[in-house]
């Protein structure tokens, strides 16, 4: 299994089990799904027998909630952004990525700038459709992960900077 981590914070962002797709050479798009989680303990796991103990009516779980699996599994934290503050963060983050690429693969930098500008123009044109997340330590220098929905309106997908991952 390949684990993709934020290059700055070392936070686990996703694994190859999520089937990442490379988009515009410099991004991964990762589909996710909604799931229901509960904080209740299933009594059957500790040997309880609800039907034998008269508890068959206790199947109602009012502590369950619907979550996006990638957000829940990795402890992503929702981050509020307006367009201006997101652009400011993006510029600082890209500076970090470009500095890293200058050392490892300088020929890639012009293409990165070009592709990121094209992709991010689309993001900024549709800014209100995106949600923003970061890993649990809330490091202000960390990658901000974008989340939107596929055309079906039900499938959440996340956008990661490929060169921001290790």
Curated annotation (Swiss-Prot):
Cellular compartment(s): Cytoplasm
UniProt-listed InterPro entries: Mss4-like_sf (IPR011057), Mss4/transl-control_tumour (IPR011323), TCTP (IPR034737), Translation_control_tumour_CS (IPR018103), Translational_control_tumour_p (IPR018105)
Alphabetical keyword list: Calcium, Cytoplasm
Record-annotated TCTP domain positions: 1-166
The keyword Calcium is assigned to this record: yes
Alphabetical list of SUPFAM superfamilies matching this protein: Mss4-like
Entry's Gene Ontology molecular function annotations: calcium ion binding
Entry's Gene Ontology cellular component terms: cytoplasm
One Pfam match: TCTP
Residue ranges of coiled coil: none
The keyword Acetylation appears for this protein: no
Family label: Belongs to the TCTP family.
Function comment: Involved in calcium binding and microtubule stabilization.
Database matches in PANTHER family: TRANSLATIONALLY CONTROLLED TUMOR PROTEIN-RELATED, TRANSLATIONALLY-CONTROLLED TUMOR PROTEIN
Protein name, entry field: Translationally-controlled tumor protein homolog
Gene that encodes the chain: TCTP
